[in-house]
Amino acid sequence: MEQVEILRRFIQRVQAMKSPDHNGEDNFARDFMRLRRLSTKYRTEKIYPTATGEKEENVKKNRYKDILPFDHSRVKLTLKTPSQDSDYINANFIKGVYGPKAYVATQGPLANTVIDFWRMIWEYNVVIIVMACREFEMGRKKCERYWPLYGEDPITFAPFKISCENEQARTDYFIRTLLLEFQNESRRLYQFHYVNWPDHDVPSSFDSILDMISLMRKYQEHEDVPICIHCSAGCGRTGAICAIDYTWNLLKAGKIPEEFNVFNLIQEMRTQRHSAVQTKEQYELVHRAIAQLFEKQLQLYEIHGAQKIADGNEITTGTMVSSIDSEKQDSPPPKPPRTRSCLVEGDAKEEILQPPEPHPVPPILTPSPPSAFPTVTTVWQDSDRYHPKPVLHMASPEQHPADLNRSYDKSADPMGKSESAIEHIDKKLERNLSFEIKKVPLQEGPKSFDGNTLLNRGHAIKIKSASSSVVDRTSKPQELSAGALKVDDVSQNSCADCSAAHSHRAAESSEESQSNSHTPPRPDCLPLDKKGHVTWSLHGPENATPVPDSPDGKSPDNHSQTLKTVSSTPNSTAEEEAHDLTEHHNSSPLLKAPLSFTNPLHSDDSDSDGGSSDGAVTRNKTSISTASATVSPASSAESACTRRVLPMSIARQEVAGTPHSGAEKDADVSEESPPPLPERTPESFVLADMPVRPEWHELPNQEWSEQRESEGLTTSGNEKHDAGGIHTEASADSPPAFSDKKDQITKSPAEVTDIGFGNRCGKPKGPREPPSEWT
C-alpha cells in the first residue's frame, strides 16, 4: 500500500475514534486504559525491573518515587567528577527511526542531581535540550533551574560552567543558546523551553508544539547524538514529544508502515520509559497532531501532481467504522471489574481496573412502556460517572441469557469465586454487562440509594454461637414443620418475601455453580409478577450455604423437614439455624414488588469484613420481626447469655395493620397497649450473672414453661404463630433440653433487640408511666 493511502486511512481512523461508543466514551479512553493496564502489568510482574533506582543511595535522586528508570534502557554515567562518581541518573534511552538511542527521556533535575544532569549532557554530546515544563507549576517546584538567565552572570555547578549567550522568544516557547564549559573545553548547545503546557493536561493548540519540533530538527537533523527531552517526571509530556517527532521522521523518510498505529508506538515506548504519555488527553493530542502532519503531507503530494494516486481509493468514515468493528471481534472481551477490601493510595486504581478490551455489543433493548413499578431501565435516569445506566442486551435463543443476580453476585463476592460453570457458559454476556459499570469508583455510590439498606439488599447474618459447654451433649433430633408462610397483607409483606426468595436463589446459584450443575435459562426481562429485590448472598464461615433444592424452587419436602442434631461445635448451631431459615424463605411465594437494581460496587460492606455483611445490620436501625430465637444459659466464661436472632422478614414498625404474634392474640391485648410483663422470678436474674450448674439443664425449662403459660403460650403440642406463619411441632418423647430447644416465639417488632437475654431482662422495659394493672 502506498504512503498516500496509509495516511488517508490513519486520518479517517482518528476521526472515527472521536465518536463515542454505547457507554458515552470515545475510543481514545478505551485504548489508553489498555496502555495503563499493560504498564501496571510491567510493574507488578517485574517484567522490566527498576532495581537500580530502588537502591537506597539512589532513592533521593528520584523526583517521584513511582517513576523509576527501567534497568535495561537506563542512561549510565561513566564521566566521574570529584563530587559525583555514581553512574545513576533517572533517565532512559528511547529508540528512534535510525538508532536505539535517539532520545534521552529524563526527569527535571533536582538540586542534588544538577551535576549528574550536566555529566550526562557532556558525556553523550547532547546538542538539543527540550524542556516541556515551567520551573514552578501550581505552586510547586517542577524543575531546578540548571541554566542562567539571559543577561546574568554564568553559573557554576562544579566542575561545569554554564552561560546563556542568547534567548529568542517564540509563541509558547523560548530558544536559548547555552555555552557549556568543562576542563578548558566548551560546547554550544540549544535549549527549547516550552512554557504553555499544563501538567497532566494538554495545551489549547498544538500548532506551537509542531512548530517547536520542526525548528528543533533544523538544528539537528541526524540521530547520531541523542536529543535530551525532559519535563517534571520525564514521562507524560516528554513521551508525547518523542512520539510526535518519531512519527514525523518516519513521514519525512516515507517509511510509515501499513499497520502504523499510535497505540503500538506508545506501547513500545512504555517498555523503554515508565508511563510515557501519561494521560488520556495527551494520548489524544498525539493522535490529532500526527493526523495534522499527515494532512499537510497529503497536500504536498497533491501539489506535486500525485492526484492520480488518490483516484478510486477513497475510504469513507462508515467503511472505517466497519473495519474498526471487525478489529474488535478479534480481541478478547473485557474482564469484569474487581473489588478490593482495602484501597491503596497512588496507582492502586491502575491495578484494579480491568482493560476495556474492544468487543461487539449486542443491540440495546428499548425501554418497555411505563408500569406501576420501576424496571431495570428506569432506575437511573442519568448516565454519568456515579450513576451508570444499566443496559440490557439481547441474547440469541440458543444462548443462555445472563443472570443479573448471578453476574453481580459474582462481582461482589469477596472470596473471588469466579471459576464456575456459570462463568464459562455466560462469559460473553456477563462480561458485557460488567463492562458497562467499570467506571464506577470503588466504595462510591449514589447517596440517593442509601436509605434503608436492609430493604434493598439481603445480608448474611453473623451469629455468635454459645459456648460448647452450654450445648446439651445429649440433644436429640427435633422435627420442624416448614409450612408455607402466611401473608395477611400483600402490600406490607411482598417486599420482605421477595427479598427472602431472591436471597435463597442467590445462595442456591452459588452452590449450584460449585457443583457444575446445569444452569436453567433466564429471560432478558423479568416478568412483572416475578420481580423482587436483587440480593447478594455472601457466604462466610459463619453463614452456612443451604443445600441446593429441586429445580422448581421449592423444598423437596415442604411439610416435614427434620433438623440435624445440634452439635457441640459453635458454628454448627449457626449453620442449622441458617438452614432452617432458608427453608422457610424457600417456601414463601413470590409476590409483586419493585425490582431494586443494586450495584455491588456501591455496597457499603461487600468487602469490609471478609465475607460478612452484618455491618449494615447494626448500622441501620430498623424493626426486625423474627420467627426463630434460641435462648441458652451462659457459661462461666461469658458474662451474659447469648441470644441468636435470625431475621426472616423486614417490616417497618409504623405500618398499620401489622399482624401480632400468637401470644398477643391469646392474651386479647389491643394494638395500643403492649402485653403484660411476666412475673419476675429469681432464676431470671441468676441466669445472666451466675455460672451454670449441671442440675440447671432441666430447671430453666420448667421455669420458662411456667412463664410462657402465664402469657397464654403452650410449650408442647401444636402451636400456630400468625405473625411468622410458622407451625412448630414439639416431640412428645423428647426430654426438655433447654440449651438446644428451638422455641418458635415471635416477639413484636418493638421488643426485638440485638443485646443479650440477661441485659434485656435486667430491668423491666415499658412506658415511663405504666398502667395500674401492670403493677
From Swiss-Prot:
Cellular component aspect of the GO annotation: cell projection; cytosol; focal adhesion; podosome
Localization per Swiss-Prot or TrEMBL: Cytoplasm; Cell junction, Focal adhesion; Cell projection, Podosome
Major subcellular location class: cytoplasm
Modification type Phosphothreonine: residues: 519, 569, 598
Modified sites of kind Phosphoserine: 19, 331, 434, 448, 467, 550, 567, 596, 603, 606, 608, 613, 673, 748
Assembly with partners or alone: Interacts with PSTPIP1 and TGFB1I1. Interacts with PTK2B/PYK2. Interacts with LPXN. Interacts with SORBS2; this interaction greatly enhances WASF1 dephosphorylation and might mediate partial translocation to focal adhesion sites.
UniProt family annotation: Belongs to the protein-tyrosine phosphatase family. Non-receptor class 4 subfamily.
Name of the protein: Tyrosine-protein phosphatase non-receptor type 12
Organism, as annotated: Mus musculus
